[in-house]
Amino acid sequence: MIGARVFCITTTALRRSPIFFFPKIPTRPVFRLSPATRPIVAMSTTSKNQEELDSIFKQKRVVRSTVRKSLKAMDPSLRTQQDEAIQKTVLEAPWFKSCKGLCAYISCKSLNEVDTSKILSEILQHPDSNTQKKLYVPWVEDKNSNMRMLHISHMEDLVANSMNILEPAPVDAQGNDREDVLQADEPIDLFILPGLAFDRCGRRLGRGGGYYDTFLKRYQDRAKEKGWRYPLMVALSYSPQILEDGSIPVTPNDVLIDALVTPSGVVPITPRATESM
Ligand SMILES: Nc1nc2c(c(=O)[nH]1)N(C=O)[C@@H](CNc1ccc(C(=O)N[C@@H](CCC(=O)O)C(=O)O)cc1)CN2
Ligand SMILES: Nc1ncnc2c1ncn2[C@@H]1O[C@H](COP(=O)(O)OP(=O)(O)OP(=O)(O)O)[C@@H](O)[C@H]1O
């Protein structure tokens, strides 16, 4: 908990800071990157040139490659155990139980992502009850980091895309356009996010498409415009995906998360997370 408070302060500073910022934070256990894969400390955004940006993206690729290897090497029974523990934590969490509208990813086995199937089926299995949650899932619009979050009511609404990830068709079986989060007039309470690597300061490394960062920034702008409360952004992580604090290279476009769900439980990061978790 003490650690979480330190991270809250640091994370708040990072969220507000227009500069690249690799704070010095007390080291926590978990997975260490070798010195060769540690990020270079970056300077201010204004003085950033493309060469420096290239260097950060290069570091990101190195971290991705390291984590992909550790995920591939994970023992299958440990993976199953961790999938169960993480999903149980989510399903029993008050912030999950109370949420009315959420965006969640459809996990993909071949990408070694934390399984979300139990969470999704729990959401979709009570279509008529009062506790029904509105579920939105990603739909990749193009290769320029554009993604939408579309409403689904059944797993049958999904088909595999070219990346072999299940997603809804933007038009349903009746030929109607699906409701889209950015067009919808109700706020989202919760985002359940995928990613390749995370740290306990709120940094998240995606798969390199920029889809989530672009989407989350747009959603935050819309929430601000509408006066909506910001949603809770929670990522799910296997133990090898949790890196030493500060080892994830970031640019100002990277959106920080509020909390991590790990096999050992929830790691609240921001004050918003600490209040609701
Ligand atoms: N389940 C899930 N759905 C998602 C995402 C995700 O990360 N997970 N996305 C999140 O953005 C978006 C899709 N973006 C994706 C970006 C890259 C890859 C992918 O297969 N990457 C390979 C490497 C490919 C390469 O380097 O050329 C990999 O990570 O192994 C998949 C989805 C929307 N839907
Ligand atoms: N050298 C570079 N200079 C500028 N932009 C780049 C560079 N390399 C990649 N990009 C762009 O940055 C974006 C990817 O950013 P980043 O690596 O932070 O994504 P991510 O965090 O993995 O993705 P997501 O948000 O989907 O989880 C893409 O739009 C990509 O085109």
Swiss-Prot record:
GO terms for biological process: defense response; tetrahydrofolate metabolic process. InterPro entries: FTHF_cligase (IPR002698), FTHF_cligase-like_sf (IPR024185), NagB/RpiA_transferase-like (IPR037171). It comes from the Eukaryota. It catalyses: (6S)-5-formyl-5,6,7,8-tetrahydrofolate + ATP = (6R)-5,10-methenyltetrahydrofolate + ADP + phosphate. Its EC number is 6.3.3.2. Optimum pH is 8.5. GO terms for molecular function: 5-formyltetrahydrofolate cyclo-ligase activity; ATP binding. GO terms for cellular component: mitochondrion. Disruption phenotype: Reduced growth rate and delayed flowering. Pfam families: 5-FTHF_cyc-lig. NCBIfam families: MTHFS_bact. Monomer. This is 5-formyltetrahydrofolate cyclo-ligase, mitochondrial. It comes from Arabidopsis thaliana.
